[in-house]
Amino acid sequence: PVDGIVTVGRWNVGVQGSGREVLLSRTQGGLVSYTFNNREFVLRRPAVTTFRALTDNDRGAGHGFERAQWLGAGRYARCIGNEIEQIDENTVKASYTYELATPQRTKVTVSYTADTTGRVNLHVEYPGEPGDLPTIPAFGIEWTLPVQYSNLRFFGAGPEETYQDRKHAKLGVWSTDAFKDHAPYLMPQETGNHEDVRWAEITDEKGHGLRISRAEGAEPFAMSLQPYSSFMLEEAQHQDELPAPKHMFLRVLAEQMGVGGDDSWMSPVHPQYHIPADQPMSQDVDLDLI
């Protein structure tokens, strides 16, 4: 057995072991602290996202108007329930039910299974919502990290950014950073996504950081590491409106719609690269601190 402690309290659930500490909040709806040798990796808890910053092609095709509900659906989602299950003396699972801020109030589940090795499994599930709803721009989580964790090494399609409809890339291990991955478009927009990722390491200059890998039997995921959140990119009209980076923003996605671009302005995304709202989606990744 691993030398560690699992503490199930009224407000929080804590797991300690191997120099790592995991703190899951009942009231705040998820992971509120994740440390390794006192290095903190959570500035804001990983939050459900159903949105991506509009691209020039999105704007030209009217996607903002058509998909406005998804901008707020994840951002204003509320936690309506939680369930704590102690699996054994070294493992605990915290499951949260979120209600998306849509007229349908679709329920999304987010669960963390943590053990005393300090590893955490993160599972996010969208059940699909029947009805005539606009397609979803993206689904997964966005996580705010301290600014020093700006280096990215990943095993996936690369080395440049890739999307469902932009995959002229090779599968391999690639190294980049959040600043290189931020394309300075005249009008800020979605940028820096990587598809078909098996694992990714987000580190500081000393190599300390976070490792994300697809769980056993799970599909590869999409991800990006940026010095700006998707909402900061969406709000800015020009690059000079973006502030000096104070945090890093990690997006880990089950799926993201394509970006289109058969021409330079009004070319919509082809139907096969949309995400139907009635399509169930899940994301299953393992987290570890390095």
Identify the residue ranges that each predicted region occupies:
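Beta-strand/loop-rich accessory regions of lumenal/periplasmic or secreted enzymes
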Residues: P1-I290
